[in-house]
Amino acid sequence: MISYGENLGGRAVSPLPVRGGHMMHGAAFAYVPSPQVLHRIPGTSAYGFPSVGPMALPEHGCPYGEVVEHHDPLPAKLALEDERKPEPGLIQKLRRAGVTLLKVPLMLSFLYLFVCSLDVLSSAFQLAGGKVAGDIFKDNAILSNPVAGLVVGILVTVLVQSSSTSTSIVVSMVSSGLLEVSSAIPIIMGSNIGTSVTNTIVALMQAGDRTDFRRAFAGATVHDCFNWLSVLVLLPLEAATGYLHHITRLVVASFNIRGGRDAPDLLKIITEPFTKLIIQLDKSVITSLASGDESLRNHSLIRVWCYPNPTEVPTPMPRAEANTSRMLRNATLEKCNHIFVDTGLPDLAVGLILLAGSLALLCTCLILLVKMLNSLLKGQVAKVIQKVINTDFPTPFTWATGYFAMVVGASMTFVVQSSSVFTSAITPLIGLGVISIERAYPLTLGSNIGTTTTAILAALASPREKLSSAFQIALCHFFFNISGILLWYPVPCTRLPIRMAKALGKRTAKYRWFAVLYLLLCFLLLPSMVFGLSMAGWRAMVGVGAPFGALLAFVVLVSALQHRSPGCLPKWLQTWDFLPLWVHSLKPLDHLITRATLCCARPEPRSPPLPTRVFLEELPPATPSPRLAMPHHHDATRL
C-alpha cells in the first residue's frame, strides 16, 4: 500500500481539501492520517492540512518540524465540510431546509438579545460609576492638561461603556461655557480609545478555541491599535499646533449652521421596548454633576417617575413610594415600569446585579450565535460568503475596495447608532474566519466615522446660542478620525494596526491569560499611571516618561531589525537571549499562572509537543515561501 504523499504526487502532502498554501514536514509528520481517522487524533481540530500550491517555490531554510501557514481566513473546520458526500434524499433535503429555516429566526433572536445585553451592560456601568465620571469631569484644572484630559476620556468611557454618553457630557460642558474647545479635544480622543474595550471583552468569549481566539482577538484589537497609534501622533501635534481646533473653527465659521432635530435612534426603537422593562436611567444626573450642580448629588440615577407622553422631558425627582402618579408643573407623572423601580436598592447594588446579568446574557448569546453561525456557514455556503466579503474589486479599482468597506462600516454604525455594537457584532465572524482581519480593518475605520455623525446630529439639536461650540467639538471628533485614517490606511506599508493586532492575537492564542492582562493594562493601569504622573507636574511627567519612551523606542527598533535585517546588528544583539528569560519571554509568568490556577486540578496526560506554527505574513519581505522538502530518510511511512 502506497503512502498518501506518493498518491498525490508529492512527499507527505495531506489530501484534505483545505484552501491555501499550507505545508507540513518533518519527522513528526512522517505519517499523514486520512480524513476518516483525523477526528480521532487529539488536538487535530486546531490544524488545517492544506495542499501545496501549484507554483514551485524555492527553498528558504525552513527547519524540519515546522508548519508553514499562509493567511486564509476560511478555517479548516468550515472547509472540511466541502468533502464529497453521498447525495441526500428528498426527505433529508426537506429536513435540512426546515432546520435551516428554524435556525435563522433563532439566530436573529440571539442577535437581538446580544445587542440588548450591550445596552444593559452600558446602564450597569453608568449605575456603578456614573457619578464618579461626573465628578472627574468637574475639575477644569485637571482637564486643562492635555494628557490628563486624554486619560479622563479613556477612564470615563470605560466606566460608562459608551462613547456617546461621554461625548455628550463633553458637548454639554463646552456649550455651557464650562470647558474650552481646546481642552475638550484630548477628552474626545480618549473617548475614542475607551469605546474599543467592548468588542475586546466580546472577543474573550471565544477563548475556547485557540485558532478562533487568535482571529477574534486580533480583529477586536485592531480598533485599539488604530486609536492608540492615532493618539500618539495627533495628540502632540494638536498640543503643539492646535490644528483640529483651527480647522473646525474655520468650518463652523464658513457654514450657516442651523439647529435641527435630535439624532435618530434607529436601533433603540427596536431595543428599548425590552431594555426599558429592565432598567431606565436619568442620565441628566451625570451631566448636572459634571456641570457643577450639587443639588442632584443624592439623587438616584434610577428613574422612578416617567412622563406618559414621550415628547415631554422628565424633571429629575427623588425616589418616592407614594402614589402611582402625581402632578408637577401641570404635567402628569406616572411610575416607570421596570424591574428596579420599587426595590429601594442603592445604585451600586443595582449596577452590580445588572453587570452580572448582562455579562451572563452576553456570553450565552455570543456562544449560541457562534454555534449557529458555525452550523449555518458550512462548505460552499462559507466559501461563497467569505468570497463576497473578502474579494476585492476588479483590477483597475482594487484600491477602492477598502474605502467601500469604510462606507459600509460607517453606514451600519449610523443605523445601529453605536460603534461598539457594530464592532462587537462582527467580532464572532472574524473569529470564525468569515471576515478577514484585512477586511475588518476598513470596516472598523468606517465605524469610527459613523459614530461621529451621531455626535454631529446631536450637536445640531443644541440651542442656537450654544450651537457653534457644540458643533465645533463634534467636528473635532470627526476630523480626528479622518486624520487617523490618512495616517494609517492609504499606503499599505503604513497599516501598522493590522500587524500589531495579528501579533497580539498570536500572543493571546498562546497565553490566553494575556488577554485579561492586556485589558487591565491598556484601559486601567496604564491610563491611571499616566494620569498620576500628569497631576504631579510636567517635570515628573518628563522625568519618568522620557526614559521610558526612549527605552520603548529602542526595544521596538531593535526588535524590528532582528526580524527584518539581523545582520545590521551586533551578534550579541541579534536575539534577546542575553537577557534573563523573564525579561523577554512570558513563559516564566505563564508557568506561575498555570501552577496557581491548576494546583487543585487533576493533571491531564500531556500530549507530545506540537510543531511551531510559522505564518507567512510574518516572514521578511521578498522571502520565498518554504516548500515541502524532506531528506530521503524522512520519507512518508509506507503502510
UniProtKB/Swiss-Prot annotation:
Stretches of the chain found on the membrane's Extracellular side: 126-145, 186-347, 437-466, 535-539
UniProt topology in membrane: Multi-pass membrane protein
Sequence intervals crossing the membrane: 104-125, 146-163, 166-185, 348-370, 413-436, 467-487, 514-534, 540-561
InterPro entries per UniProt: Na/Pi_transpt
GO cellular component terms given for this protein: apical plasma membrane; brush border; plasma membrane; vesicle
Modified residues (Phosphothreonine): 508, 623
Gene Ontology MF term list: sodium:phosphate symporter activity
GO biological process: intracellular phosphate ion homeostasis; phosphate ion homeostasis; phosphate ion transport; sodium-dependent phosphate transport
Keywords annotated in UniProt: Cell membrane, Disulfide bond, Glycoprotein, Ion transport, Membrane, Phosphoprotein, Sodium, Sodium transport, Symport, Transmembrane, Transmembrane helix, Transport
Residue ranges, Cytoplasmic side: 1-103, 164-165, 371-412, 488-513, 562-639
Pfam families with a match to the protein in the record: Na_Pi_cotrans
Major localisation: membrane
Glycosylation sites (chain numbering): 298, 323, 330
Modified residues (Phosphoserine): 14, 34, 607, 625
Subcellular location field: Apical cell membrane; Cell membrane
Record field: catalytic activity: 3 Na(+)(out) + phosphate(out) = 3 Na(+)(in) + phosphate(in)
Cysteine-cysteine disulfides: 225-522, 306-336
UniProt function note: Involved in actively transporting phosphate into cells via Na(+) cotransport in the renal brush border membrane. The cotransport has a Na(+):Pi stoichiometry of 3:1 and is electrogenic.
Family stated for the protein in its record: Belongs to the SLC34A transporter family.
Subunit-structure text: Interacts via its C-terminal region with NHERF4. Interacts with NHERF1. Interacts with TMEM174; regulates SLC34A1 internalization by PTH and FGF23.
This protein's name: Sodium-dependent phosphate transport protein 2A
Species assigned in the record: Ovis aries (Sheep)
Organism ancestry: Eukaryota, Metazoa, Chordata, Craniata, Vertebrata
